Amino acid sequence: MDLENVSCPICLRKFDNLQALNAHLDVEHGFNDNEDSLGSNDSRLVNGKQKKARSVDSSAQKLKRSHWEKFKKGKSCCHTCGRTLNNNIGAINCRKCGKLYCRRHLPNMIKLNLSAQYDPRNGKWYNCCHDCFVTKPGYNDYGEVIDLTPEFFKVRNIKREDKNLRLLQLENRFVRLVDGLITLYNTYSRSIIHNLKMNSEMSKLERTVTPWRDDRSVLFCNICSEPFGLLLRKHHCRLCGMVVCDDANRNCSNEISIGYLMSAASDLPFEYNIQKDDLLHIPISIRLCSHCIDMLFIGRKFNKDVRMPLSGIFAKYDSMQNISKVIDSLLPIFEDSLNSLKVETAKDSENTLDPKNLNDLARLRHKLLNSFNLYNTLTRQLLSVEPQSHLERQLQNSIKIASAAYINEKILPLKSLPAILNPEGHKTNEDGQKAEPEVKKLSQLMIENLTIKEVKELREELMVLKEQSYLIESTIQDYKKQRRLEEIVTLNKNLEELHSRIHTVQSKLGDHGFN
């Protein structure tokens, strides 16, 4: 018998001799955990010689192993990754909880006493799993916390104050410049000779509003950094005095009519009123750099856009979104109730159904169909709005496709609705009072003719389906002109589903349908 190359029968690890194997079984797999085996000093015969079994220490110094999970070849799995444990990936017990893990998922070390309990002061370091590591006392319980919020507030307030001061400075310069230019225009615009003097006075006023930077030392535009030359002239911003270029492609500076500037900043305290004094078409322009334009007018434009009412397209789309939220909230409730009803009828089809549940489901279905009809009406109204730009036309097409896909997706679950969800109306008894609704069996309800309520709801559904079919067909025609073939394939599939559903509804209606 070869006693030199032996393998562990549990984890298949190879050892040079039996002594190493016995020590491995005692330490790693807990075969020497009993008191008898821990205190035994029986000798073993190895290669014809007596040798004492190797032990980690005396029995009083060994870690508790009775709680360790026993290894079963081909059955034991790692509690973290779930892989079957073998010699390649290892089979190691967590010293704390005793569960088996592979070598990869037992990387942590904790201090334990001989009873396998947490002992950070007097314990020794042992391998443990991630769960035992993170659940030890004191793990991530506390730490140094430095609240930097006041510092961030301070920095933000400084930057905000600087920006507000800069904006206030530009606004004061702008008001002073506009009022001065209008005053000069009203004074000198009556004769040609006075016009020559007016230009000189305006130039002096512009230089007094803000100091201009010496353009002789400036070789590059302060915004786009392009070098000045014969084709790229130097200009001064009338509010900040910075030297910029006049390239139309880069928009570093622009000459803007004073009337449009006043209308864009109508909240400023100008001396003149643009409407009363008829200043909208006054022939005076002011050159401003892009930085000053952004600081003065972007915030005002944003606030103005927020206060403005939504355009026709966006108003209709907002209403469509509100209806879709109602549909999304009602549809799961309806489907859950319908599924529970199907489960009840599947158990025993001869049982009578609760009339209260039937009425609730019929009411939910009626709400859903009305919501779909309203959603479809809003879609038609949105498409009838004349777009004001190419962007709005693109938005209309996108909304048309999205609404068709939405209704096609949401309304199809209603096609499986059985006739039991439309109970007959309450009947009156002989005394003239309303009696309880008649409860029928499922087999009886499925073979009867359609009621007036069913015909009405099927007609509403058919109307919605035909409208969606028309929308998709028109979209397909538009996409054929634009050669968007990939999207046409998807739309054709949706159209086939709609036609199939339309045919089903029409077959149910029969003579009660309409063309």
Swiss-Prot record:
Where found in the cell? Vacuole membrane
One term of GO molecular function: phosphatidylinositol-3-phosphate binding
Q: Which residues cross the membrane?
A: none
The record's annotation in Pfam families points to: FYVE, Rbsn
Q: Where is Zn(2+) 4 bound in this sequence?
A: C237, C240, C289, C292
Which parts of this protein are zinc fingers (C2H2-type)? 6-29
Query: Which residues of the sequence carry a binding annotation for Zn(2+) 3?
Result: C221, C224, C245, C252
Query: Domain of life here?
Result: Eukaryota
Name the membrane topology term.
Answer: Peripheral membrane protein
Gene3D superfamilies, alphabetically? Answer: Zinc/RING finger domain, C3HC4 (zinc finger)
| Zn finger (FYVE-type) start-end | 72-137, 215-297
Among SUPFAM superfamilies, the record links this protein to: FYVE/PHD zinc finger (SSF57903), Rabenosyn-5 Rab-binding domain-like (SSF140125)
Task: Tell me the CDD domains matching this sequence.
Answer: FYVE1_Vac1p_like (cd15761), FYVE2_Vac1p_like (cd15737)
UniProt GO BP: Golgi to endosome transport; Golgi to vacuole transport; vacuole inheritance; vesicle docking involved in exocytosis; vesicle fusion
Q: Give the residue ranges for region: Disordered.
A: 36-58
Q: A GO CC term?
A: vacuolar membrane
Assigned keywords, A-Z: Membrane, Metal-binding, Repeat, Vacuole, Zinc, Zinc-finger
Annotated positions binding Zn(2+) 1: C78, C81, C102, H105
Ligand binding (Zn(2+) 2): C94, C97, C129, C132
Listed PANTHER family: FYVE-FINGER-CONTAINING RAB5 EFFECTOR PROTEIN RABENOSYN-5-RELATED, RABENOSYN-5
Q: What is known about its subunit structure?
A: Interacts with VPS21, VPS45, PEP3 and PEP5.
Miscellaneous note of the record: Present with 768 molecules/cell in log phase SD medium.
Q: What does this protein do?
A: Required for vacuole segregation and vacuole protein sorting. Possibly part of a complex which tethers the vacuole membrane to microtubules, either directly or via kinesin or dynein-like motor proteins. Probably functions in several interorganelle traffic pathways.
State the name under which the record lists this protein. Vacuolar segregation protein PEP7
What species is given as this protein's source? Answer: Saccharomyces cerevisiae (strain ATCC 204508 / S288c)
